[in-house]
Structure formats: structure tokens, C-alpha cells
Amino acid sequence: MRYAFLVETYATERIKVLSVWSEFRDEDLPVRPRPADPRGRSVHEQMVHQCVSEDLWFRNMLGIDVCGAGAHMLPPQETRLEFIRRYAEDSGKRLSALQSKDEPWWEENVKFFDVQRSRAWVMVRRIAHTSHHRGQLMAMLRILGREIHSNYGPTADTGGLMANHAPTVYAYESVEALLAGEERGGAKAKLPGADGKAVTERPGRAPAKAGSSPPLRSGSE
């Protein structure tokens, strides 16, 4: 099927969301990028937004409703583990629905806010939207001084730069393993660290002057 790559991408993206959520602690949920600035979503609000936004896009744009018209898109108790369980369940149902769709379904135009776009186009935008917010949460983990497992490739905690052949180390091998591990209090893969190697492209260097932008090497995280 021509659009199988979108289904496969969603299947891996949902795991990445859950993996990043699993890196937080319960006490992190109220944390914002700047404590006194309400413009930046807290960790809690990012989880709420992911559940609500994805439900709305799938239901109103793609025609896939797994939450009963939005009635059950949030967990009854808004804790870290309950958000993980809710998103794992709902995104799994969405994945099953996507796997049943044929090419004409993907190519049909639907309403995307105030314009018409194909469902395939909408799905690309949905994946990008999710990735954007996941990146914000990964930045929050660094602000909190936490370790980060792989999301797309190496991170500073899995070995540093891809150019130095740092390994990719995922927190869990599957959604099922993630749920089981987090219910036991956490059972993530061990992180090797960088063993003294550089973990960023310009370690220890002063910021470049305005107008100067040297090319970057393939990096991490």
C-alpha cells in the first residue's frame, strides 16, 4: 500500500512519545520552562495537549474516533503513569484503524481547519506536530538535569555524537515492555554515557559572532 510508510511512522512515533513521558518523574508534572511564566506549558499540560490534540485531529480531520467523541481522551487520574496508559491504549487503537485503510481513503480530501487537504497530507502534519511537542519535553528533561535515552538516534547519555559511532539505546524495546516496566517503578535500559567523548558539536566553545554560522556535523538527540 502506497501510504504504509505513514502507518509505520505513526507506529514508531507513538512509542517515542511514551518513551519520553516515561523519563519524567511524578514530581515533574507541574514544572514549566520558566517557573513564573505561564506561557510555557508544564509537563502536565504537554501530556494533556498531546491526548486532546491527537484525539481532535483524528476524530475531526481523519474520521477516526477511539475516545467516544472525546469523552475519554484523558485519564481519570492525571498522573504520569495514567497518562502513559491512556495514550498507549488510545494510540494503539488509532494505529489499528490506520492499518485497515486503503489508498482511496488516504487520498480523499478532508477539512483541515479552513482548507481541504488529503488525509495523507494531514497525517504528515500530525506526525510533525507530535514531534514538535515531544522535542519540547526533551528540552525540559535537560532543564531538569535528567538522562535521556534514544529517540531517533544517539544522545549525550547513550554515547554522544553519531559521527563518533555512539550507539542508539532505547529505554524499552516495545510498548508492552514500557508499560510493564513503568508499572514496576521503571526498568529502562542502562545508559553507557559518553566515556569522555564530546556530546555536542561545539563543546566548550564560545557562541559564534552574528553572521557566522559554521556547518554542523551530524549530531545527537
Specify the residue positions occupied by each region the protein language model found.
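Active-site rim elements
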Residues: 1-8, 78-84, 124-127
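Short, contiguous alpha-helical
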Residues: 7-18, 29-73, 111-178, 182-206
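Hydrophobic alpha-helical core bundles mediating ligand binding, dimerization, or RNAP-core interactions
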Residues: 10, 14, 21, 87, ...
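Membrane-proximal, proline-rich intrinsically disordered regions
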Residues: 24-26
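Helix-adjacent hinge/juxtasegments
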Residues: 64-101
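Acidic catalytic patch
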Residues: 99-113
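Ser/Thr/Pro/Gly-rich low-complexity, intrinsically disordered segments
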Residues: 205, 211-213
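A cross-taxon signal for low-complexity, glycine/charged-rich
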Residues: 214-221
